[in-house]
Amino acid sequence: MGRIVIAYKIFPSESTVDLELLKEKIKTQLSDIASIQKFVEEPIAFGLCALIVNMVLPEDVEGILDKTEKRLTEMEEVGQIQTLGVNRL
C-alpha cells in the first residue's frame, strides 16, 4: 500500500478562532483517514495565523484527497484551505 504526504495551509474563518482547539478538531475529524505528522502556526497579518498541517494518507483509497479537503472545509472554524504540496512516500 502506497502512501502520500500532503501539506495544507489552513486559514481560520476568524481571527478569534482558537488554533489549539482547531488542531484537536482536525485530528479528530481526520483520524480514520489520515495520520497527522505536525502542525505549524504561520503568522499572516494583524494577529491572524494560519495552520500548516502535514499529514500522511493512503494512496490506494479512491478520492482520498477530495474527502480530506471536504472534511476540512466543512469545519466552521476553517475559512479556506490551500494545498502546499503532495508527495509520494
What would you call each of these model-derived segments?
Residues 1-89:
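Long, contiguous binding/interaction regions
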